[in-house]
């Protein structure tokens, strides 16, 4: 009897079939790991998700804080020393990665009177949206473009560019670059110039005069994958959205909105980034919307709030905020307001992966 009881106790302690298969699987995983392989079935739900998963967080940077802190940097480092005196607007969901969204960098650059940010070029495309100041310039591909608040300036892939401030006041603008996309593909290149400034042979507004007037310089390319216009001035764009508003051309989600376009083909200004400018009447309450492009917004005028998945971000002039991809959001305007926005939508559309949700919620 004692022998039979001992036998039963031993059987009860013996590993069952499930334990055996788990042990066999673990041993298998350890063996294949030595050959730099791993099973897809253990991670499938993480790499092929039912809906977008993002680390990007809703966040707002108020201009009072931005300006105060950027101005402080002027006493600490020169534009020449820094090459570009910029404070990165870092998304708290991706701390330490120099990203505002997963695919876009954003920062605020300041250039003081008399300073020059030296000429260079890089594979990453860049845009500037002017926040504060008057009379500083960006020189791009030989054209010196003087800037004013609300101007939208583009610097395409590998275009030589430098900045200077010939005014008597500081100039601040928002920089947005696509280098997270470029670095994902591991295709970053950059080049410094021997001189601080590039030779400029084209007058301010030269590219706009040619390419946005219905005529082209003889011999100019008939198709470009980026806009040849350097500066989309606020003075030209603001009246257009004003006319749309007066005509009642108001989207229930986006207000009276225009898209900055390549005048050659009507496409986006850059292959990796697209921008819009929207006017909202006082009292506007937008319907909910979401899309797969994480978007950076700037308040050019007015006052209001954007609610993102139930979280309200209250904004005013020159405040910058981020709406993460595939998060429901809606705008409301306490007074007539203008919002500039930029995202990676053109890149997603080129890959056939951009999606929006405009249905009732």
Residue ranges of each PLM-predicted region?
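A short beta-strand-loop-beta hairpin characteristic of the jelly-roll/cupin
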Residues: 112-149, 155-159, 289-317
């Amino acid at each position: 009897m004692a022998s039979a009881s001992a036998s039963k106790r031993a059987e009860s302690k013996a590993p069952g079939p499930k334990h055996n298969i788990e042990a066999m699987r673990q041993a298998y995983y350890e063996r294949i790991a030595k050959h730099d392989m791993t099973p897809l079935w253990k991670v499938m739900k993480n790499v092929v998700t039912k809906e977008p998963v993002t680390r990007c967080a809703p966040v707002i940077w108020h201009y009072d804080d931005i300006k105060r802190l950027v101005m402080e940097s002027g006493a600490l480092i020169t534009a020449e020393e820094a090459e570009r005196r910029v404070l990165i607007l870092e998304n708290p969901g991706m701390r330490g990665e120099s990203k505002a969204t997963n695919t876009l960098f954003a920062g605020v650059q300041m250039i003081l009177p008399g300073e020059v940010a030296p000429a260079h070029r890089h594979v990453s495309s860049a845009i500037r949206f002017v926040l504060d100041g008057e009379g500083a310039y960006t020189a791009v591909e030989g054209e010196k473009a003087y800037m004013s608040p609300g101007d939208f300036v583009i610097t395409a892939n590998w275009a030589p560019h430098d900045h200077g401030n010939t005014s008597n006041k500081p100039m601040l603008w928002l920089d947005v670059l696509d280098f997270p996309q470029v670095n994902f593909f591991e295709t970053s290149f950059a080049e410094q110039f021997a001189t601080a400034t590039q030779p400029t042979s084209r007058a301010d507004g030269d590219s706009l005069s040619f390419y946005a007037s219905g005529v082209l310089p003889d011999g100019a390319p008939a198709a470009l994958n980026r806009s040849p216009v350097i500066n989309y001035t606020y003075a030209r764009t603001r009246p257009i959205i004003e006319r749309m508003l007066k005509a009642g051309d108001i989207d229930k989600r986006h207000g009276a909105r225009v898209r900055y376009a390549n005048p050659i083909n009507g496409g986006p200004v850059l292959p990796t980034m697209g921008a819009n400018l929207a006017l909202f009447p006082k009292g506007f309450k937008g319907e909910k919307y979401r899309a797969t492009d994480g978007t950076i917004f700037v308040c050019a005028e007015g006052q209001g709030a954007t609610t993102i998945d139930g979280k309200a971000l209250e904004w005013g002039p020159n405040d910058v905020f981020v709406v993460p991809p595939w998060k429901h959001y809606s705008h409301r305007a306490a007074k007539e307001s203008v919002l500039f926005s930029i995202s990676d939508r053109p890149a997603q559309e080129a890959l056939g992966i951009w999606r929006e949700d405009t249905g009732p919620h």
